[in-house]
């Protein structure tokens, strides 16, 4: 029944197998794609119009060398250097091993918050520690009365059955339970970090490795809050939301973009001595930075390759921003659409290198400073102010029907005349404006009853100014992308 339901998103194929007796060759596959998200009536109409399989306009498909039957990859893609590679013997990629996946907490609602205080994370840690003491005592009692089942596996099973699973007190995961079975107490001394959880939506993070399921390599990208860096984030393989890239100056969440992979400008490493660290920081004098060295993440192999083509003045920072410009190029993402879904991005060598670097830097500066306030009148936007109250009540809403030129910010403020083209800047399947409207809403987690209020992040006009700013960023991003020079692979 669901095959013909309106707008069904489940991929369905009707297969007709024809057996020909005495055939002297292998079989063929003929294919016809009728389109996506059709209504029930449209699907039935197509079948009715064709009447017979003989009337269908079939396309014979032959697998590529990559084994692709449909959505075949571009064979030119493999001629380019990959952005990164975890294989130590593959040193010809742009970043080699110097990249990370986005941070994955497995308990976002407990660790991430718009509020500056991490009261929920601390409350969970305190509950964890109390549970550990209680279970340890029960285990000791068990050992005194039982002579079998006293090993580590028995203890793990015992703790599994005994621990509290109250969803409003704790969020268990495999990693946290492993700490529990090892009887590791967790202290509440942690640093607060900024994380971009979704496009253009920052949250406060209680940065404690024991309660972050997959912290990845972020300590080598941002060792502490006073260490600066910028990081290009790209969609991981398998995305059905289209390929995207975004840049931040903070930690990135695993779902900032789909299964995010993150490529920093710098990599930090612990120094052998304070003297060597100071020399390696190009005379940086920030706080405790003397205990770390900083180097560019782009490899020497790639630098040598680019200098051989574009000249000796090219540096690793130029290459970093060149990469960001290429990843924003519509021609690149369209030419290698299927490759970007299935493989790590590979970056071509293009003509007009200096222009790509210039626009890559401009795009990065725009996206890194997306919170900078903008005058709504300069964008031709009308703001109807019935009361100067900038609190988001529940959530923002678009106009009636499909009208996105209007946003009801709250009961007292309405924003009108939002340019239609502002919605054409798409990040991870949605416009940047839609991400703001969706993410900056008051939410209550059903399992934990934790309330997350975006008004607590910066207060005042922050969310209002952010919304206006993102409209401007969306328009300027498209202007800069339109300035990209001719896409010509060398």
Which residue stretches match the model-derived regions?
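Sequence-level detector for compositionally biased, low-complexity segments
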Residues: 1-490
């Amino acid at each position: 029944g669901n095959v013909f339901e309106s707008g069904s998103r489940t991929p369905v194929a009707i297969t007709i197998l024809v057996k020909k007796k005495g055939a002297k060759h292998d079989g063929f596959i003929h294919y016809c794609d009728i389109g996506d998200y059709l209504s029930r009536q449209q699907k039935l109409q197509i079948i009715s119009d064709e009447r017979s399989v003989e009337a269908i306009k079939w396309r014979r498909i032959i697998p590529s060398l990559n084994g692709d039957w449909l959505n075949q990859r571009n064979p030119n893609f493999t001629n380019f250097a990959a952005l990164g590679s975890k294989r130590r013997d593959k040193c010809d990629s742009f970043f080699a091993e110097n990249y990370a996946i986005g941070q994955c907490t497995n308990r976002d609602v407990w660790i991430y918050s718009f509020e500056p205080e991490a009261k929920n994370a601390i409350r969970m840690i305190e509950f964890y520690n109390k549970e550990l003491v209680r279970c340890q005592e029960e285990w000791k009692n068990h050992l005194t009365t039982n002579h079998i089942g006293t090993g580590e596996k028995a203890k793990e099973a015992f703790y599994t059955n005994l621990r509290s699973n109250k969803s409003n007190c704790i969020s268990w995961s495999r990693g946290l339970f492993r700490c529990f079975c090892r009887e590791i107490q967790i202290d509440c001394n942690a640093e607060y970090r900024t994380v971009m959880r979704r496009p253009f939506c920052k949250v406060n993070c209680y940065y404690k490795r024991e309660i972050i399921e997959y912290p990845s390599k972020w300590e080598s990208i941002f060792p502490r809050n006073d260490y600066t860096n910028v990081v290009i984030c790209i969609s991981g393989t398998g995305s059905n939301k289209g390929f995207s890239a975004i840049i931040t100056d903070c930690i990135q969440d695993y779902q900032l973009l789909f299964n995010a992979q993150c490529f920093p400008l710098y990599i930090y490493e612990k120094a052998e001595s304070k003297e060597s660290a100071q020399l390696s920081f190009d005379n940086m004098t920030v706080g405790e930075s003397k205990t770390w060295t900083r180097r560019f993440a782009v490899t020497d192999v790639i630098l040598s390759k680019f200098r051989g083509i574009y000249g000796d003045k090219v540096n690793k920072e130029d290459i970093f921003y060149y990469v960001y410009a290429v990843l924003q190029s519509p021609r690149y993402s369209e030419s290698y659409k299927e490759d970007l879904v299935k493989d790590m991005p590979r970056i071509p060598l293009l003509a007009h290198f200096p222009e790509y670097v210039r626009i890559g830097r401009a795009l990065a500066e725009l996206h890194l400073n997306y919170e900078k306030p903008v005058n709504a009148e300069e964008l031709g936007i009308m703001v109807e102010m019935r009361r100067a109250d900038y609190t988001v009540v529940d959530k923002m809403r678009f106009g009636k029907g499909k009208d996105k030129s209007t946003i009801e910010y709250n009961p007292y403020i309405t924003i009108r005349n939002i340019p239609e083209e502002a919605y054409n800047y798409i990040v991870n399947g949605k416009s940047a404006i839609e991400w703001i409207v969706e993410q900056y809403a008051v939410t209550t987690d059903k399992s934990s009853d934790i309330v997350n209020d975006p008004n607590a992040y910066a207060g005042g006009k922050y969310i209002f100014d952010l919304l206006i700013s993102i409209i401007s960023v969306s328009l300027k991003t498209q202007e800069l992308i339109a300035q990209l020079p001719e896409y010509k692979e060398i």
